[in-house]
Curated annotation (Swiss-Prot):
The lineage of its organism: Eukaryota, Sar, Rhizaria, Cercozoa, Chlorarachniophyceae. It is an enzyme of class 3 (hydrolase). Residues 174-176 are annotated as: G5. The gene is tufA. PANTHER family: ELONGATION FACTOR TU, CHLOROPLASTIC (PTHR43721:SF5), ELONGATION FACTOR TU-RELATED (PTHR43721). GTP hydrolase that promotes the GTP-dependent binding of aminoacyl-tRNA to the A-site of ribosomes during protein biosynthesis. This is Elongation factor Tu, chloroplastic. Residues 19-26 are annotated as: G1. Residues 136-139 are annotated as: G4. One of its GO terms (molecular function) is GTPase activity. It holds the Pfam family GTP_EFTU_D2. It catalyses: GTP + H2O = GDP + phosphate + H(+). Mg(2+) binds at T26. Residues 10-214 form the tr-type G domain.
């Protein structure tokens, strides 16, 4: 069956749902796709299509970041349904690093929970620029005052993590009630169901409040590999988000990081099961690569314009060490500390070889949470690194630092 072509008409925005497990993120994602499809007369994705990996079906929990697409009148969205369980924070980091904005889902019946805060902190750390809040399960709360208290609590929490609590849109509704109404009918216009209207109001706010991102289309092409699979008879496909630049079918690219750099040719491009001739910054794309076996390429590598980026094991970086209140370490650490460095879609263990004060460049014996330091790092595996690149430092399930590469050594 021939694939249809992807038509680029509206600006493309990457968005995601974040929040505590079972607060209704996946239900909301399904309600959004179905509501927008129903208003425009197309077909939306049902809940079961979004919770797509087999292990999620068994647990009813979203594990790997599911990608869905939908359109409002003004934009085309790629939607990442972010996992809500603590052990999947790693996925959230790679999923969230690709978000231009997020919808924070909070159950009106429970209010903010520990993971709500953890996801907000992560959103701050990985640089999600804007957040809109959906106060879900409104149908389960009889007392209007209770909902107002939850809303106040959410605004205070947003302020704590440096998001504008006062001006952030908070939309009340029930994803489940909207979804049930949408299941009963294929086409629905605005005004025909109050629960569906609340979902459409949410998306109006997302359209207005989350800015259209500036894409780096004029820089050399780079895509961090998120996933790899083989298509029988066609070859190996690498998927990921194009970070910068653009790529066309027939272009020669390099696969960089973790192993020897390899050169290959792009023989096919797809986005949401549609064919592309060219892919640009911001696209979530599948790329067919000539002569590459599934074993040759893995998550954490990058596909890039030849010569534009090289693999390295050692670099200097300016790093902020998070305080206990920000979710970081409670205790200091010393030279020789070996945490995980999260860069794009990969995490690699690295040893901190030296520590210097950010203020006067003097050697530091010990680093305390809250410090800003310059550190030299030696990674156990080479990955694609460049000056100005951001990364997170994590250990034992918590983010301990956030940094920027200041110098590439070797």
């Amino acid at each position: 069956m021939a694939r249809e072509k992807f038509e680029r008409v509206k600006p493309h925005v990457n968005i995601g749902t974040i929040g505590h497990v079972d607060h209704g993120k996946t239900t909301l994602t399904a309600a959004i796709t179905m509501a927008l499809a129903s208003v425009s007369g197309k077909k939306g994705k049902k809940y079961d299509d979004i919770d797509s990996a087999p292990e999620e079906k068994a647990r009813g929990i979203t594990i790997n970041t599911a990608h869905v697409e939908y359109e409002t009148e003004t934009r085309h969205y790629a939607h990442v349904d972010c996992p809500g369980h603590a052990d999947y924070v790693k996925n959230m980091i790679t999923g969230a690093a690709q978000m231009d904005g997020a919808i924070l889902v909070v159950s009106g019946a429970d209010g903010p929970m520990p993971q709500t805060k953890e996801h907000l902190l992560l959103a701050k750390q990985v640089g999600v620029p804007s957040i809109v809040v959906f106060l879900n399960k409104e149908d389960q709360v009889d007392d209007e005052e209770l909902l107002e208290l939850v809303e106040l609590e959410i605004r205070e929490m947003l302020d704590t993590y440096d998001f504008p609590g006062d001006s952030t849109p908070i939309i009340k509704g029930s994803a489940l009630m909207a979804l049930q109404a949408l299941m009963e009918t294929d086409e629905m216009s605005r005004g025909s169901n109050p629960w569906v209207d609340k979902i459409l109001t949410l998306m109006d706010n997302v359209d207005e409040y989350i800015p259209t991102p500036e894409r780096e289309t004029d820089k050399p092409f780079l895509m961090a590999v998120e996933d790899v699979f083989s298509i029988t008879g066609r070859g190996t496909v690498a998927t990921g988000r194009v970070e910068r630049g653009g790529v066309k079918i027939g272009d020669v690219v390099e696969i960089v990081g973790l192993r020897e750099t390899r050169s290959t040719t792009v023989t096919g491009l797809e986005m949401f099961q549609k064919m592309l001739q060219e892919s640009i910054a911001g696209d979530n794309v599948g790329m067919l690569l000539r002569g590459i076996q599934k074993a040759d390429i893995q998550r954490g590598m990058v596909v890039a314009q030849p010569g534009s980026i090289t693999p390295h094991v050692s670099f200097d970086a300016q790093v902020y060490i998070l305080t206990k209140e920000e979710g970081g370490r409670h205790t200091p650490f010393f030279k020789g500390y070996r945490p995980q460095f999260y860069v794009r879609t990969t995490d690699v263990t690295g040893k901190i070889e030296s520590l210097k004060s950010d203020e006067d460049n003097t050697e530091m014996r010990m680093v305390v949470p809250g410090d800003r330091v310059t550190m030299s790092v030696e990674l156990v595996q080479p990955i694609a690194i460049e000056k100005g690149m951001r990364f997170a430092i994590r250990e034992g399930g918590r983010t301990v630092g956030a940094g920027v590469v200041s110098n590439v050594v070797s």
